[in-house]
């Protein structure tokens, strides 16, 4: 909705869902990311497909893509793909980025080792990663302070959407932090 305008109709879409716009079929497919429920878009035209996976991270360990992801991308095997619009962070670096499981393990090791205050910087959109940090901190009886409007808003939305449920007193306001 745009401020000051009438309500604009919208469509709620799911992974594997489709909508039609004129002669173009718009299809959605799931992608792996630290943002829950991330999806790519396929524009199916009479000439072939135009694809954008959006923001994604291959779910892989040691360069081997997961079976779930292999299955998800198999929809492209027999398709006539005209254009794939994608980008890659750190493309100039050889190899793969760390698998999310290893990122989680690294964070767990750091959180476990630090006895005092710890500051973790993260993208506010990395909900899965942030939820993991909160859950692990809970197992150790540690408190979490969120700072930044986007960080607070995204976590509130994730909690309201049922993506994770922190214990009542795990996330505290910054004013409750002792010097």
Which positions does each model-derived feature cover?
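His/Asp/Glu-rich metal-coordinating catalytic cores
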Residues: 1-178
């Amino acid at each position: 909705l745009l401020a000051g305008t009438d309500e604009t109709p919208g469509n709620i879409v799911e992974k594997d869902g489709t909508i039609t716009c004129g002669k173009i079929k718009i299809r959605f497919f799931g992608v792996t990311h630290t943002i829950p429920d991330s999806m790519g878009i396929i524009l199916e035209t009479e000439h072939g497909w135009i694809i954008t996976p959006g923001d994604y991270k291959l779910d892989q360990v040691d360069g081997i893509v997961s079976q779930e992801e292999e299955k998800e991308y198999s929809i492209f095997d027999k398709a006539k793909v005209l254009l794939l619009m994608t980008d890659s962070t750190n493309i100039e670096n050889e190899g793969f980025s760390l698998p999310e499981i290893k990122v989680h393990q690294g964070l767990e090791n750091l959180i476990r080792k630090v006895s005092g205050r710890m500051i973790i910087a993260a993208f506010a959109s990395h909900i899965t990663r942030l939820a993991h940090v909160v859950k692990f901190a809970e197992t150790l009886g540690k408190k979490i302070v969120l700072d930044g409007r986007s960080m607070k808003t995204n976590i509130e939305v994730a909690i309201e959407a049922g993506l994770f449920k922190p214990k009542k007193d795990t996330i505290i306001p910054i004013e409750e932090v002792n010097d």
